[in-house]
């Protein structure tokens, strides 16, 4: 893991503003930070080069594009094999990158190995994904699903 760079109060103010609106102008940021536009531009470039700002994206509400069902799927993989060419973890990690329904995958401690956040149209789409994709993967031993009933908090902003 890379070491974090030192952020001062102005860097944090800039980051909070950019997380609220990634299209904010440098002039508006300058007003927020109490600096000139060129000083803000230099700080933003430094944050980008250091990887603190990874990218700028459009946030798309899943429901607005027909993906009304969110599922969290706990996945357990088969045990490691002696064959180095068939490592279940490596096979699964590679496969999950190609599944468009999976928008987030985290390796876990505890009973299950991975937690997937999956966006699908409806229960039929979910059933097809589980039956035809996830459970067909040779490394997957078991999975357990929970469905989102109501989203109480949903943010991409990091508390800086």
Can you annotate each of these PLM segments?
Residues 1-160:
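A compositional/biophysical signature of low hydrophobicity enriched in polar/charged and small residues
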């Amino acid at each position: 893991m890379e070491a974090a760079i030192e952020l001062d109060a102005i860097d944090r103010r800039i980051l909070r503003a950019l997380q609220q609106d990634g299209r904010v102008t440098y002039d508006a940021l300058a007003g927020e930070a109490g600096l000139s536009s060129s000083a803000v531009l230099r700080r933003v470039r430094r944050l980008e080069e250091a990887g603190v700002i990874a990218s700028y994206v459009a946030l798309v509400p899943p429901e607005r594009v027909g993906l009304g069902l969110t599922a969290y799927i706990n996945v357990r993989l088969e045990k490691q094999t002696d064959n180095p060419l068939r490592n279940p973890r490596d096979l699964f990690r590679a496969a999950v990158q190609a599944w468009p329904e999976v928008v987030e995958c985290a390796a876990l401690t505890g009973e299950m190995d991975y937690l997937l956040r999956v966006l699908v149209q409806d229960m039929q789409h979910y059933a097809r994904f589980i039956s035809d994709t996830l459970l067909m993967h040779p490394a997957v031993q078991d999975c357990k699903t929970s469905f989102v009933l109501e989203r109480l908090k949903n943010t991409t902003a990091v508390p800086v």
